[in-house]
Amino acid sequence: MLVIHNRIEPQAEWAAELHLNFEARSKSRLRCFSAENEDVGLFLQRGQSPLRDGEFLQAEDGRIVRVCARPEKLMHVTCSSTFELTRAAYHLGNRHVALQVGDGWLRLLDDYVLKAMLDQLGATTEAIEAPFQPEHGAYGGGHHHSRAGEEDFNYPPRMHQFGVRK
């Protein structure tokens, strides 16, 4: 078994590839198979962002492994105006939906309930198959509503530096 614990900087060469959908790339513990059909065990640090397409890992035996985002069934969402697209993104965000944001479009995992909502909002949805690379979120960590154990959920901002003045 190829055992992997570490993420590393991009490399020019690699010995194996992992083709994983978004759900699998979001797990810190995973048993899967490489593209070369080798049994793989992922034991990554918990609380990190999902693996991204093109990211590199290093196995215990020193081999370099490249992560590839496997195509999956998605909804490609467009709207006739920026306002309507922003409104669609707002309603999807209220439902805590993983969302890939592009220039004039949104992508999310295929879901018939969300499709019906988007149709009611006047959005155009198209079923596609593509790698899914959703936004990780501004705070880069877990999500919770409880105040209990709040010190365990003190994630520094990743996109903004609130309260920092120049």
UniProtKB/Swiss-Prot annotation:
Annotated GO biological process: protein folding; protein-containing complex assembly; urea metabolic process
Gene Ontology molecular function: any one: unfolded protein binding
Residue ranges, annotated region (Disordered): 133-156
CDD domains: UreE (cd00571)
InterPro entries reported in the protein's UniProt record: UreE (IPR012406), UreE_C_dom (IPR007864), UreE_N (IPR004029), UreE_N_sf (IPR036118)
Pfam families reported for this sequence: UreE_C, UreE_N
GO CC annotation, single: cytoplasm
HAMAP family named among the record's database cross-references: UreE
Protein family (similarity comment): Belongs to the UreE family.
Protein name as annotated: Urease accessory protein UreE 2
Organism: Pseudomonas syringae pv. tomato (strain ATCC BAA-871 / DC3000)
Lineage: Bacteria, Pseudomonadati, Pseudomonadota, Gammaproteobacteria, Pseudomonadales
